[in-house]
Amino acid sequence: KQGLETLDPNGGMAEEENQRATRGLSTVVHPMIAEAATQFNAKAIAELYPSGGPVKTVIVGDPSEEMEEQAKRVKDYMNYQITQEMPEYFPDLDQMLFQLPLVGHTFKKVWWDANLDRQCSQFVKAEDFIVSPDSKDLYTSSRYSHVIRMPRNDYNKYVKAGYYLQSEYSGNDTDPSGDIGSEIEGVDPYGDEGTDEVMTLIEMHTYYTFDGIDGGEDDDDDNVIALPYVVTIDYDAEKVVSIRRNWDEDDEKQQRRDWFVSYKFLPGTGFYGFGLFHMIGGLGKAATGS
């Protein structure tokens, strides 16, 4: 939160500029950071989403004609999925690559959507992804959570598809991270009662042991090995709406499946990376003041 609070539309200098305006001074902000973020976005999007599609294949070992044809089929099909069946992929990637250099850390979630019946890719903001700052990396973290905001009508579709349990809407007066995001974007959240109901879900990817299953008989047994699950909670109703196994059914080792990709701009002092506001935010202020 400390790093994100600097990301208001004026580069973290809103209060200072209000004081300058009161004194009759110029409120023009030096575009140093905005220019750097725009240049990074333009170069990165060209590399990660070329005109032919973002997927490339590499054959490990000695290639044969049959393997090359198979690799081409895989590449063509995956590019078709991304460019034709996933309309959210490009705008989400574009937005992520602009925010990444600013905040220093972003995430992408890739999963099979039970409602849309297809693969989906979603840009997840840093303030909507909760993980211990002491974690070494995403893949060795014992628990992390994704804050999901979903229109009530969409939630009902997932209930009908058997993905979530029914949960009565109880309002969203509080939000675990919405206040931070609204402050960053400079907007005031609002909603029309009855027509704009938004469910706030906490999707926790964690290790747990349930009574009577997982090979454990006693929760106090220190030798019991917890297994990976995805537990989803209705934040406002304080109700569990989904518990799902998070390993392949045929996997004897029962290893956790990871649905998120972590992107760092620069290495930080902990789990989260550093961005331009962390590194040259003070320089931007100095350039504006001069």
Residue positions per predicted region:
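Extended alpha-helical, oligomerization-prone segments that build pores/tubes and scaffolds
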Residues: K1-S290
